[in-house]
Amino acid sequence: MNKLANGPNYKVKPRRRREGKTNYYKRYVYVISKQTRFIVRITNKYVIVQIAKIDPKGDIMIASAHSAELAKKFGWKGDENNTPAAYLTGYLAGLRAIKRGVTECVADIGLHVPSKGNRVFYVIKGAIDAGLKIPIGDISIENDRIKGEHIAKYAEKLKSENSDLYSKLFSRYLQRGLNPENLPSHFEEILNKIKSSGG
């Protein structure tokens, strides 16, 4: 139930907090620390990564990566916001940050809940594997999920049980010419392309 705006002590939260965009307490901590931030945001369609440095005049963007680039530049045929895409976007951002002289960052996951299996940690894992140092504590990362093996297994099972639902759920993959059962090998192909490009 929403708290009603009444009484002399009611305080309106800042606009960006009301919109679910900024956690001002965390923002304050980042500003005080003066460390370079590895910013991860995941929308309903995409994964967005930015590496930014705090500056009194505003954040200075050092490098960035967007999961839409995976399809446009590297031929990715899966969804742009699933776990493998999250890892690949993080890896791409990590390579670009290193290219610009960044070696260490702190993770800024915004208002994402740091729960087990959250895709934000797969983005960070991608950047770490690219060579960036980002402390994430004791978060467990499942390697089979990085490659999309869980998606491939589910697709294989669904195809044999309900082909109509299979075609509906994986329509984007199929339209792009990828059988979702082959996602792990496709992931490896795209990862190698990103490595070869150097970011």
UniProtKB/Swiss-Prot annotation:
GO cellular component: cytosolic large ribosomal subunit
Keywords: Ribonucleoprotein, Ribosomal protein, RNA-binding, rRNA-binding
Record keyword Ribonucleoprotein present: yes
SUPFAM superfamilies membership: Translational machinery components (SSF53137)
Name of one Pfam family that matches: Ribosomal_L5e
Keyword rRNA-binding: yes
Database matches in CDD domains: Ribosomal_L18_L5e
Highest rank taxon of the organism: Archaea
An MF annotation (GO) of this entry: structural constituent of ribosome
GO BP terms: ribosomal large subunit assembly; translation
Assembly: Part of the 50S ribosomal subunit. Contacts the 5S and 23S rRNAs.
Protein task: This is one of the proteins that bind and probably mediate the attachment of the 5S RNA into the large ribosomal subunit, where it forms part of the central protuberance.
Entry similarity comment: Belongs to the universal ribosomal protein uL18 family.
NCBIfam families tied to this protein: PRK08569.1
The protein's name: Large ribosomal subunit protein uL18
Species whose genome carries this gene: Saccharolobus solfataricus (strain ATCC 35092 / DSM 1617 / JCM 11322 / P2) (Sulfolobus solfataricus)
Gene name, Swiss-Prot/TrEMBL: rpl18
